Amino acid sequence: MAELTTLARPYAKAAFEFAQAANQLQSWYEALEVSAAVAAQEQVKKALAASALSAQQKASVFVQVCGDQLDEKQQNFIRTLASNKRLALLPYIKELFARMKAQQEKTIDVEVTAAYELPVDLINKLAQALSAKLDRNVSVHSSINKSLLGGVVIHTGDTVIDGSVRGRLAKLAEALKS
């Protein structure tokens, strides 16, 4: 996966720089979301892997599947990816583009996992505290995992804050083994 991300990075950067210069970050993000979803479809993967189709034919089919959701510049981007045999990288390109967009807009998605459903006011307080700590606008998504026993686990990017009872018990067990 790291290799695919490395291959996707220059394409994501080029798309981001173009979208930023054209003041179309959201439009490009939405187009990449659609394109990545199309590229992830099993039938599309098989069609892209078929050697019987030329790069131009693959791009044409791909653009047709996306329909009117891509403007001319975005279609050209798809054609460039097809000519370089990189259409399969679209999910990685979308992810890298999303990170660059979030960095530019100073936003971050935070996943909060708790043993039980958290009250809305607690989620709002948590969002405010994280926003102040991270100096970003925070978008909180919550989920439930009963195996945590209590507390919360917060995921943001590559950072994990484990405030769960299960995590504390694991640390205690590790300390007792030492």
Curated annotation (Swiss-Prot):
Protein name, entry field: ATP synthase subunit delta
One Pfam short name: OSCP
Membrane topology label: Peripheral membrane protein
Organism lineage string: Bacteria, Pseudomonadati, Pseudomonadota, Gammaproteobacteria, Cellvibrionales
Organism field: Cellvibrio japonicus (strain Ueda107) (Pseudomonas fluorescens subsp. cellulosa)
InterPro entries reported in the protein's UniProt record: ATP_synth_OSCP/delta_N_sf, ATPase_OSCP/d_CS, ATPase_OSCP/dsu
Cited PANTHER family: ATP SYNTHASE DELTA CHAIN
Gene Ontology annotations for the cellular component aspect, listed alphabetically: plasma membrane; proton-transporting ATP synthase complex
Subcellular localization(s) per the UniProt record: Cell inner membrane
Gene3D superfamilies linked to this entry: N-terminal domain of the delta subunit of the F1F0-ATP synthase (1.10.520.20)
Keywords, in A-Z order: ATP synthesis, Cell inner membrane, Cell membrane, CF(1), Hydrogen ion transport, Ion transport, Membrane, Transport
PROSITE patterns according to UniProt: ATPASE_DELTA (PS00389)
Subunit structure: F-type ATPases have 2 components, F(1) - the catalytic core - and F(0) - the membrane proton channel. F(1) has five subunits: alpha(3), beta(3), gamma(1), delta(1), epsilon(1). F(0) has three main subunits: a(1), b(2) and c(10-14). The alpha and beta chains form an alternating ring which encloses part of the gamma chain. F(1) is attached to F(0) by a central stalk formed by the gamma and epsilon chains, while a peripheral stalk is formed by the delta and b chains.
Keyword NAD: no
Protein function: F(1)F(0) ATP synthase produces ATP from ADP in the presence of a proton or sodium gradient. F-type ATPases consist of two structural domains, F(1) containing the extramembraneous catalytic core and F(0) containing the membrane proton channel, linked together by a central stalk and a peripheral stalk. During catalysis, ATP synthesis in the catalytic domain of F(1) is coupled via a rotary mechanism of the central stalk subunits to proton translocation. This protein is part of the stalk that links CF(0) to CF(1). It either transmits conformational changes from CF(0) to CF(1) or is implicated in proton conduction.
Protein family according to the UniProt entry: Belongs to the ATPase delta chain family.
One of the record's GO molecular function terms: proton-transporting ATP synthase activity, rotational mechanism
